[in-house]
């Protein structure tokens, strides 16, 4: 294990909805890659306990998706609160990157950052202010090379660790097909 400012930290969170003012985090997962997108380590995958009141705020899509994946049951059984989830995630990340060096990496990662600012500010503060957002590249490909879109498909499991693995694979695909690296 080598701490390096070149390593990239990938995070995905599942939430009860899209509004950090009204919704809460259900799950957080982390993966660290090197600069070439080789996975160095998978961090903790943490379901965060939320009250029945918070879970009741979910719309039908979230209820169906997170119940089908088993996440709702894991959240109800979890002993983790947001503070403990942040502490364990930071303990893992600090083994791989110095503070404020890694951009926050993922798909639509700006949404995760919004939830971090509201609910996990200590974790958000650990990251560089920049993002590596795979969805930005996808939106550009949709406009400039739409023929590539069908060549990469995701499962859409909406399980945090699976979503990160798919985001890394998607960026590898774009690196080889769009950037030709």
Curated annotation (Swiss-Prot):
GO molecular function: 3'-5'-RNA exonuclease activity; nucleic acid binding
Domain Exonuclease, residue spans: 8-171
Main location (coarse class): cytoplasm
The keyword Phosphoprotein is annotated on this UniProt entry: no
One GO BP annotation of this record: DNA metabolic process
GO cellular component, as recorded: cytoplasm
UniProt-listed Enzyme Commission number(s): 3.1.15.-
Gene3D superfamilies: Ribonuclease H-like superfamily/Ribonuclease H
Active-site annotation: 129
Keywords noted in UniProt: Cytoplasm, Exonuclease, Hydrolase, Nuclease
Localization (cell): Cytoplasm
InterPro entries listed in its UniProt record: Exonuclease_RNaseT/DNA_pol3, Oligoribonuclease, RNaseH-like_sf, RNaseH_sf
Database matches in Pfam families: RNase_T (PF00929)
Entry annotated with the keyword Nuclease: yes
Function: 3'-to-5' exoribonuclease specific for small oligoribonucleotides.
Family: Belongs to the oligoribonuclease family.
Name under which the protein is recorded: Oligoribonuclease
